[in-house]
Every structure is written in C-alpha cells, then in structure tokens.
C-alpha cells in the first residue's frame, strides 16, 4: 500500500498504570466522584470480573482492566496487613 509505513509501533503503558496501588486509588477516586460506593463496586468487580462495576469516568475502567484481578487482591491484602504491623 503506498504511503504506509512498515515500521512497528510499540505501545507502552505509563509505569503508574501498572502499579496496582495507584490504579486502585485512581479507580476509587473516580467511583467516589461519580457518587458510587467505591468499596461495593470494587468488590463486585474483583468477585465477578465484570468491568461494568467500574465507571468509565476518568478512564477508571480501562485502568483497572490493565491489572489482573489477583494482583489487585494481592495489593489490597498486602496493604491491609502492612497497616496492622505499624
């Protein structure tokens, strides 16, 4: 095809988009801003895997889908247990 490039374009996520803790904070803020119960919505998503539990506001749904649910759960448990040790 004339005018097309045969160069490969690479997409790189920003590092903060792969940090489960930061993603959870952004998703929490988006849910809260929209008037949802962030805890209920995040738990619903973690249990079901259904992304419609998460608002698309502020790109929250796209952000949370970049992280595996088990990684999000691991971050939540780690954060909770670390706070117990303080």
Curated annotation (Swiss-Prot):
Pfam families: IreB (PF06135). InterPro entries: IreB (IPR009309). Signal peptide: none annotated. PANTHER family: UPF0297 PROTEIN YRZL. Belongs to the UPF0297 family. This is UPF0297 protein STH1998.
């Amino acid at each position: 095809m004339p005018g097309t490039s045969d160069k490969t374009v690479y997409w790189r996520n920003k590092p903060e988009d792969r940090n489960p803790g930061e993603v959870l904070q952004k998703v929490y803020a988006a849910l809260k801003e929209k008037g949802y119960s962030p805890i209920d919505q995040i738990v619903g998503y973690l249990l079901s895997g259904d992304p419609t539990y998460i608002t698309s506001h502020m790109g929250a749904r796209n952000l949370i889908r970049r992280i595996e649910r088990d990684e999000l759960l691991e971050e939540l448990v780690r954060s909770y247990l670390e706070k117990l040790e303080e």
